[in-house]
Amino acid sequence: MKLLIINPGSTSTKVSLFEDGREVATESVFHDAPVLLQFENVNGQVPLRMQVCREFLSKQGVSPEEIDVFVGRGGGAYPQKSGVCVIDERLVEDTRKTVSGSDHASKLGVLCAWEFGTECGKPMYTLDPTNIDELDPEARITGIDGIYRKSQLHALNHRAIAMAHARKTGKPYRDCRFIVAHIDGGVTVAAHAEGRIIDTTEGAGGDGPFAPTRLGSVPVLGVIEYLEKGHTTEEVRKMCSRAGGFVSHFGTSDAEKVHRMAEEGDEHARLVWNAMIYQIAKSIGEMACVLSGNVDAILLTGGLVRFEDIVEGIRSRCGFIAPIELYPGEAEQEALCHAVLRVLRGEEEAYIYTGEPVWNGFPWEKKS
């Protein structure tokens, strides 16, 4: 059985071919911000991402019709529970509309899988979209009545890495208390406890550390002043997930380039690079407080964990909290494949997207 795994990110498209659970080939294609910002919105990137997938299959000598199941990373629709979800017309429509409010590249996995699946008449699935919602009530509240913090993170990799580390330690995931930091084109930091992601930075929502493509937490008055100078809300929205961070400072989302600039003595690049590390460490500290200081491990994952100075910068500030474990890159392709295989073998059940958010407000708001 052949599975095509489609995993679009803010700076790359990663595609894998699995056969009977075995990885046959994987390719990751980098997309710098100037290329992606040519598109008016994320939906406009579908042809580009589909081209990457088709070229990958061509290199493997496999036609789309030979694929048995198409699996895509998800996001953009209403928040749902964790697990495997069937990709159907309702999910695709809400994903296109970005009803969740976060227009992130992860949604393209569902849209590309849908294009392939409908073209070839094959089943399609997604797993742990970026907005699975398991937050504690306290994590939702803000200082403005009616505005709530959302669960918006690299949920697929967070859960895959947390579960892998739990297996490594011999404990069930539900009994572990982890802080996971996914560090790549976007950065999200979350607290895991009782088998749930109970709090997280809202990665593509202007919250938490800034990143190569994201603005992170910015003082609200500063944003108001920015808008008063003639900038638009659409510009700010783009900076939340596509045009902030390194892109705003340097016009590129290429971390290698910015790191090289910093190493070669560019003061601006050095300060911005170190500030990103500082902010990641600060968010880890916040999540340690969420877990009342009872933390089994801090798990660092994502593509930028390959940079030693990022790891050491976090270790120097957060090493007192808990042991720091490294999982460079991500485990998303394997997680997508094996979860869907468990469904196909009848070991787990896929759920159908409801078209309603899993959390829809507090009881006192539902008065008639």
Task: List where the protein language model places each region.
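Structural signal for terminal/edge beta-strands and the immediately following C-terminal loop/tail
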Residues: P328-S368
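Glycine-rich phosphate-binding loops at beta-strand->alpha-helix junctions
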Residues: V295-I314
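Short glycine-rich, Thr/Ser-proximal phosphate-binding strand/loop in the N-terminal lobe
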Residues: L3-G44
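Conserved phosphate-binding/catalytic loops in two-lobed NTP-binding clefts
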Residues: E308, E312-H338
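Adenine-nucleotide phosphate-binding core of ATP-dependent small-molecule kinases
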Residues: K238-G293
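Short beta-strand-loop/turn "lid" adjacent to the catalytic site in phosphate-handling enzymes
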Residues: L57-A105, P123, N131-T142
